[in-house]
């Protein structure tokens, strides 16, 4: 081999090393720049704290409704009586504006517990519990009426009261969210 060929190989090797080094520095710089941007898309600690709540059901008497706050919204938790459950299950689907069975709105084995988001599906008012013709909820803003299962029966509301995601941690405690 001649001296010129050795120099070309060394230059090529040196050039490859410089390209690899520059590329590595650029990649590290890009990651360091993008990491805070991507991390800022994650929910903040206060949002995560509000994403789920646990509610003790042992203080809610049969026939009573309590309101808790979840993600800034009122949530109605009702301990229904056997009569209210039977009444809700006797309703024909053809009588409902937004047909949904009572069984679909509660957790199996916990039929007495109804958990709904307390916001009228018409314009977002908060309905009053144990009011109206159907002894469920009555929206004072525009007169929508819900039965004891939170299903809309009369008025301008197009949908039933929403059921939030929830699970039973024990027989006397639920986690909403």
Swiss-Prot record:
One cellular component (GO) term of this entry: plasma membrane
GO MF: 2 iron, 2 sulfur cluster binding; metal ion binding; ubiquinol-cytochrome-c reductase activity
Organism superkingdom: Bacteria
Localization per Swiss-Prot or TrEMBL: Cell membrane
Disulfide bonds: 125-141
Residues in Rieske domain copies: 88-175
Pfam families tied to this protein: Rieske (PF00355), UCR_Fe-S_N (PF10399)
Family: Belongs to the Rieske iron-sulfur protein family.
Catalytic activity: a quinol + 2 Fe(III)-[cytochrome c](out) = a quinone + 2 Fe(II)-[cytochrome c](out) + 2 H(+)(out)
Annotated EC: 7.1.1.8
Functional summary from the UniProt entry: Component of the ubiquinol-cytochrome c reductase complex (complex III or cytochrome b-c1 complex), which is a respiratory chain that generates an electrochemical potential coupled to ATP synthesis.
Sites where the protein binds [2Fe-2S] cluster: 120, 122, 139, 142
Name the record gives this protein: Ubiquinol-cytochrome c reductase iron-sulfur subunit
Organism lineage: Bacteria, Pseudomonadati, Pseudomonadota, Alphaproteobacteria, Rickettsiales
Oligomeric and partner information: The main subunits of complex b-c1 are: cytochrome b, cytochrome c1 and the Rieske protein.
Extra facts: The Rieske protein is a high potential 2Fe-2S protein.
Keywords associated with the record: 2Fe-2S, Cell membrane, Disulfide bond, Electron transport, Iron, Iron-sulfur, Membrane, Metal-binding, Translocase, Transmembrane, Transmembrane helix, Transport
Predominant place of localization: membrane
